[in-house]
From Swiss-Prot:
Protein name (Swiss-Prot/TrEMBL): Nucleotide kinase gp1.7
Superkingdom field: Viruses
Molecular function as annotated in GO: deoxynucleoside-phosphate kinase activity, ATP as phosphate donor; kinase activity
Species name: Escherichia phage T7 (Bacteriophage T7)
Tagged with keyword Transferase: yes
InterPro entries the UniProt entry points to: SaV-like
Catalytic activity: dGMP + ATP = dGDP + ADP; dTMP + ATP = dTDP + ADP
A single BP term in Gene Ontology: symbiont-mediated suppression of host innate immune response
Residue pairs linked by disulfide bridges in the UniProt entry: none
Entry keywords, A to Z: Host-virus interaction, Inhibition of host innate immune response by virus, Kinase, Late protein, Transferase, Viral immunoevasion
EC number of this enzyme: 2.7.4.-
Residue ranges of the region described as Disordered: 97-118
Enzyme class: transferase
Assembly and oligomerization: Dodecamer.
Length: 196
């Protein structure tokens, strides 16, 4: 696969749709879980064990897992850390049944339809309009070969995907992912304006 082969990269790194819990989307417990992950499916006894684990580990870091999690008064067969050595304290905290339930949509592998609503500032940011309805992207395209413009667009796609959600607000995640998708459209729209 070449550096600028967007289709192959897309297959290996499918875009994440911007809905659901940022911590779950990013698989990163440094973000707060907003999903109340798993709390709806637990028995009352399992909920009690989660509460004990959370209380036993108050003030300890979220990235602890396995035997690093203090589990006194929690039977081994009911301890999630015993059943899944990779589960972190942050993930256990996300299952806290004492947290209010947030009914946010979960991401599914088939959730690949573009949003019906446009996100303001993505497709026509006013600061990129130069004069007489000429956009900066047109000037950029006209100053490059098709391969250079392809690299410029794919570089921006990569930039927006890498930074998506890093500002830890869902609105920024959605906007960054929308910008990444928009650069694909920009390449198709303006590649004919490039010089040979």
């Amino acid at each position: 696969m070449g550096l600028l082969d967007g289709e192959a990269w897309e297959k290996e790194n499918p875009p994440v749709q911007a809905t659901g819990c940022i911590a779950c989307l990013e698989k990163d417990d440094r973000y707060p879980h907003t999903c109340n992950k798993g709390a709806n499916d637990m028995t009352e006894r399992e909920q009690e064990m989660i509460i004990k684990l959370i209380d036993n580990n108050e003030g300890r870091p979220d990235d602890l897992n396995g035997c690093g999690i203090l589990c006194s008064n929690v039977p081994c067969h009911l301890c999630p850390a015993n059943n899944d050595q990779k589960i972190t304290l942050g993930e256990i905290r996300a299952m806290d049944p004492r947290k209010p339930h947030l009914n946010k949509p979960e991401v599914t592998p088939t959730d690949d339809q573009p949003s019906a609503e446009t996100i303001e500032g993505v497709t026509k940011p006013s600061h990129y309009m130069l004069f007489d309805d000429i956009e900066a992207i047109e000037v950029i395209a006209r100053s490059m070969t098709v391969e250079q413009f392809k690299g410029y667009c794919f570089g921006n796609i990569l930039k927006y995907r890498l930074r998506a959600g890093k500002k830890s607000e869902l609105a920024y995640l959605e906007k960054d992912l929308a910008k990444a998708d928009f650069y694909k459209e920009l390449f198709e729209k303006h590649k004919d304006k490039c010089y040979a």
